Curated annotation (Swiss-Prot):
Belongs to the UPF0145 family. This is UPF0145 protein Tlet_1264. The lineage of its organism: Bacteria, Thermotogati, Thermotogota, Thermotogae, Thermotogales. It holds the Pfam family YbjQ_1. It comes from the Bacteria. InterPro entries: UPF0145_dom_sf (IPR035439), UPF0145_YbjQ-like (IPR002765). It comes from Pseudothermotoga lettingae (strain ATCC BAA-301 / DSM 14385 / NBRC 107922 / TMO) (Thermotoga lettingae).
């Protein structure tokens, strides 16, 4: 599966647009790690536990988006974008979405 944030893929022609595909997940951190993160905000710097949380969530969202595209018979997903939102305290949703397409090498 070819993934692109652009609308076109160099060296390929889009021969069919199959529709929008998306993948999302909601993740939360363990209470103990959340308390440690709260103290980290006082000192400043990267909160690694949250960085890891969002990286894991983004990867899951991407895999779910790819699974949707594969069900449609897509070769690629173009125009990929990401969104995130706080669902509740200490829980974040990550959304990956794009357009599933069939492509042909030029």
């Amino acid at each position: 599966m070819v993934l692109a944030t652009t609308e076109q893929i160099a060296g390929y022609e889009i021969i069919e647009t199959l529709g929008i595909v998306l993948g999302n997940t909601v993740h939360s951190k363990h209470l103990g790690k959340d308390i440690a993160a709260a103290f980290k905000t006082l000192a400043g710097g990267e909160i690694r536990s949250y960085t890891e949380l969002l990286t894991e969530a983004r990867n899951i969202a991407i895999q779910r988006m790819i699974a949707e595209a594969e069900k449609l018979g897509a070769d690629a997903i173009v125009g990929i974008k990401f969104g995130s939102s706080s669902v509740m305290q200490s829980a974040a949703e990550v959304l990956a979405y794009g357009t599933a397409v069939k492509i042909k090498k030029i």
